[in-house]
């Protein structure tokens, strides 16, 4: 079955989101939102599918959210064209390979605009040397067919990486090419086109910045590195080791010399800034030397916790990207006591769903 997207209703669903966002934000008196559209199809750069076995056949499936019925997928127009191409070739390549298809229950795909793809095969069985040899042959066959592919095998407490567990993305952002290492099983922005819109919007509205930037939850440095051009220095925190390593690589790959990444949670950083705790990880970093006039936050769906919210309020400017406008509005009840919204944007990161991504820039009231 080929799932068709309701592209004819794209404008209507986007209009409804804009209306919903305006209503939610009305109590905070924001300016009119800037609206950034998604491509109509093939916009999602990563996808996960369950694998269904039926006698000698196997295929990708998804489950209908309402009926819970399984849907057989040959193509998936939500995902990038590269993922769609790989879906067909991969299943055809492993269908007759017993070692590769036996107890395979899920396939994860991560693709880039730079035409690279990482495929993770997940199993309910132990993986050994026999699997590795078959997987190496599969990878070479896929590369022979023109795919720039990395292949990973996963099972309980097992991860087999044939070459690398990452691929490098190259995004055109505000007139320059930005290199971003993307690590398997780590967070990356799913909609590359909308991610570019978010980065360029953030660059544009912080062009007049003074002093330094602090970013909490920086991931692989997606925003930190793009925004570095607008600030004297950038200090960024991240808790996940693979993301920190990717961010350090990205700093070097992009020739950026004013970004410092530290591995700690937002809560730990708050304690360090308040002098409540000392951390060995901060040796050689003088937090007091940073003059952070702007703080950037892109928190999880739960929003900012109370302690971090209090810390964030101390900064003259707050750039807040939210994947959940409800928790954003809850946080704004506190933040708008001391700040006003100077910019608002809606990013249609997840078209044809109720999910909205939005951004606000808040500036301290005089």
Swiss-Prot record:
GO terms of biological process kind: tRNA methylation
EC number per UniProt: 2.1.1.-, 2.1.1.35
Active site (UniProt): 323, 357
CDD domains with a match to the protein in the record: AdoMet_MTases (cd02440)
PROSITE patterns linked to this entry: SAM_MT_RNA_M5U, TRMA_1, TRMA_2
Pfam families: tRNA_U5-meth_tr (PF05958)
GO CC field: cytosol
HAMAP family assigned: RNA_methyltr_TrmA
Annotated function: Dual-specificity methyltransferase that catalyzes the formation of 5-methyluridine at position 54 (m5U54) in all tRNAs, and that of position 341 (m5U341) in tmRNA (transfer-mRNA).
Cross-referenced NCBIfam families: trmA_only (TIGR02143)
Protein name per the record: tRNA/tmRNA (uracil-C(5))-methyltransferase
